């Protein structure tokens, strides 16, 4: 891969640190406080669709669900092989982080009943929104630097639309969607780290020869 296509060395760590801090902050503020749960529930109840509209919107959730996103991520990783195996591996690593992290956190993090009307399991982060973020992360690793801005803007919009759909259907709260965006940051940073791994050794070996 050309040097000019590699990210700045600090960018992966900025993304991973920022995403982790955002994820922790959202959990502590939105899930572990009374005011956070009240705000989350108020937004959910305000935006939640009626039954008739929800039935019409539900098929969209399947069309852009995790299974479809996993297939698209695999295709992006295969396309990444044209730019080198580390690029393909980085795209896959970023996607896996986005796909696995929500499932682990939803099981590991408890949701205390502070302002909820009844005991509820933790739903932070959203797996569906994180699956869309997984595809965005894979693309951000694979595409040339000149296209990353457009992919980032369109991808962020796609995650936002999926998030709005999930809230409208009553499946997730606003904090769940924001947490998925943080997971996306961590996934992107991880993908960039894997992509850039070994590049310094390659450059050194080439110079020595």
Show which residues each predicted segment covers.
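Membrane-embedded catalytic cores of phosphoryl/pyrophosphoryl-handling enzymes
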Residues: 116-209
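Hydrophobic alpha-helical bundle signature of multipass membrane enzymes
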Residues: 2-119, 140-141
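Cytoplasmic juxtamembrane interface segments
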Residues: 1-12, 170, 198-203
């Amino acid at each position: 891969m050309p040097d000019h296509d590699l990210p700045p060395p600090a960018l992966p760590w900025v993304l991973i640190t920022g995403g982790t801090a955002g994820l922790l902050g959202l959990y502590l503020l939105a899930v572990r406080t009374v005011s956070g749960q009240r705000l989350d529930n108020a937004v959910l109840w305000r935006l939640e669709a009626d039954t008739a509209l929800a039935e019409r919107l539900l098929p969209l959730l399947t069309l852009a669900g995790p299974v479809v996103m996993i297939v698209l991520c695999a295709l992006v990783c295969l396309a990444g092989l044209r730019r080198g195996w580390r690029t393909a591996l980085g795209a896959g690593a970023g996607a896996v982080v986005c796909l696995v992290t929500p499932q682990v956190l939803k099981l590991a993090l408890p949701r205390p009943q502070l302002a909820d009307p009844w005991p509820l399991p933790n739903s932070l982060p959203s797996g569906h929104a994180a699956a869309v973020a997984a595809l965005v992360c894979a693309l951000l690793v694979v595409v040339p630097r000149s296209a990353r801005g457009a992919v980032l803007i369109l991808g962020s919009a796609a995650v936002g639309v999926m998030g709005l759909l999930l809230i409208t259907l009553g499946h997730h709260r606003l904090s769940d969607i924001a947490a998925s965006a943080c997971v996306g940051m961590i996934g992107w940073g991880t993908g960039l780290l894997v992509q850039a791994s070994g590049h310094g050794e390659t450059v050194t070996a080439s110079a020595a020869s």
